[in-house]
Structure formats: structure tokens, C-alpha cells
Amino acid sequence: QEHKDLNVLINNAGIQYDQTLLDETYTLQKIENEISTNLTSPIKLITSLISVLQNNSNSAIVNVSSGLAIVPKAKSAVYCATKAGIHIFSKSLRYQLEKVKVFEIIPPLVDTEMTKGRGKGKISPQRLVDEFTKAYKNNRYEVNIHKVKLLRIINRISSKIADRIMKGITV
């Protein structure tokens, strides 16, 4: 009731531990934090606000997943799994909701605090916003950003090649 005029919900929070299950410092607590932050919390937030969104015109939910939801990398299996969960949840939610538009942003590596010291070829947050804004205005609900467009094509042509590309990514 406090947010009765809310018409857009953006789920952008995320954490990623760049570790494998074999790393002794990758604890059950870290795993639970990753799942809670990346998957459970957005679902709970949507559930708690769905009636408000349904009652307002031009309502939208924007979930941010990751290119790693499409093709995972060797490290960060739990992160990849949570983002794949957001990907499928967004698609399913789109089927359920007629009055609320459900968008999914599927970005590559973005230059943020979370990715500091990781990877090359990051895109700026502004580039992500610009690409998403175009998609939002055109009601394109599954928004592959920058390199993810190419990753999708490669994965469709040969998932083995996509897997090899991602397996080589260590950051």
C-alpha cells in the first residue's frame, strides 16, 4: 500500500563469487548468499509487489540476468545457475502476466564494482542502459546486450563451440 503508484520494478542486485565448489573458501554461507541475492530475493520482491503492478497501467518488471545464464563459465557455477533461474523465471512470468510487461536484460561483462579486476572488453553501464532503452520502447522483452547477441548465435549453431569459448574464460 505504501508503493501504490509503483509501475516499474527493476531487479538488478547481484553478487558473484568467482570460485569453484572445490575451493575451500567457497562456503555454504556464500552459496546461500548468492542464491538468495540473485534468485530468491527478486522472486520474493516480485511476489510482494505483483498486485500493485497489476493494478497500474504501463507496468513493467525488469530482471537482469547474464550471458552466463545462456552459456556458463567454468568458475561461478552457482552464479550461472541463479542467472539461468532468473532467465527461465522471467519467461514463465511473461506467460502468467497479461497486464505487466516482463523484460529480461541479458548483459555481457559490465564495468561495475562487482566486476572490478575481472575480464576484458567490458561494456559501460551507460551502453547497457542505451541498448535496453531502445528495446524497452519497442517492447522487446528478451534483451541480449552487446556480445550476448553473438554468443546466442554461436550457441544456436554449435553449443560445443560456445562451451569451448566460455570454458576458456577464467575471470
Report each predicted region and the residues it spans.
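A short helix-coil junction within the Rossmann-fold of NAD(P)-dependent oxidoreductases
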Residues: 2-3, 48-57
